[in-house]
């Protein structure tokens, strides 16, 4: 099991488990729910398959909502403005010499430069919304399998 169930979750599990068979879905890393134009991430998900059906019971904390239309508009605006001007994003504001800030050098992220999943537009979009270093943005993108919304949510925690 990925994590222990809370008291309320355990009660629901026992109640439903007695009536229908529940089979844990192993190695669940992320669950997202899209309701109309809003995407929610389920934090620390635990999922069970209800035997004899195609249904899944999900336990976890509902993350902050993300308006997909608004995010798409911001992304398109970011691409348009980056084509118009090559101004710095938030990650460009960070000093090139980390000793100036008294900050240790961040761990370098090794990413294949020919990997088409990593785009400069995604990095610029995230940097316009979240104050983070370029390396942190790339690391969040890689860890979230290049999902911009998930990467932004990881960086805002």
From Swiss-Prot:
GO CC terms in record: cytoplasm; nucleus
Keyword Translocase tagged: no
PROSITE patterns for this protein: NAC_AB (PS51151)
Record's keyword terms, sorted: Cytoplasm, Nucleus, Protein transport, Transport
Gene Ontology biological process terms, A to Z: protein transport
Transmembrane segments: none
InterPro entries xrefs: Nas_poly-pep-assoc_cplx_dom
Gene3D superfamilies in UniProt: DNA helicase RuvA subunit, C-terminal domain (1.10.8.10)
Biased composition (Basic and acidic residues): 81-107
Region (Disordered): 81-116
Subcellular location: Cytoplasm; Nucleus
Keyword Nucleus included in the entry's annotation: yes
Every NAC-A/B domain range: 6-71
All residue ranges annotated as the UBA domain in the record: 118-157
The protein's role, per its UniProt record: May be involved in mitochondrial protein import by enhancing productive ribosome interactions with the outer mitochondrial membrane and blocks the inappropriate interaction of ribosomes translating non-secretory nascent polypeptides with translocation sites in the membrane of the endoplasmic reticulum. EGD2 may also be involved in transcription regulation.
Protein family per UniProt: Belongs to the NAC-alpha family.
Protein name: Nascent polypeptide-associated complex subunit alpha
Record organism: Encephalitozoon cuniculi (strain GB-M1) (Microsporidian parasite)
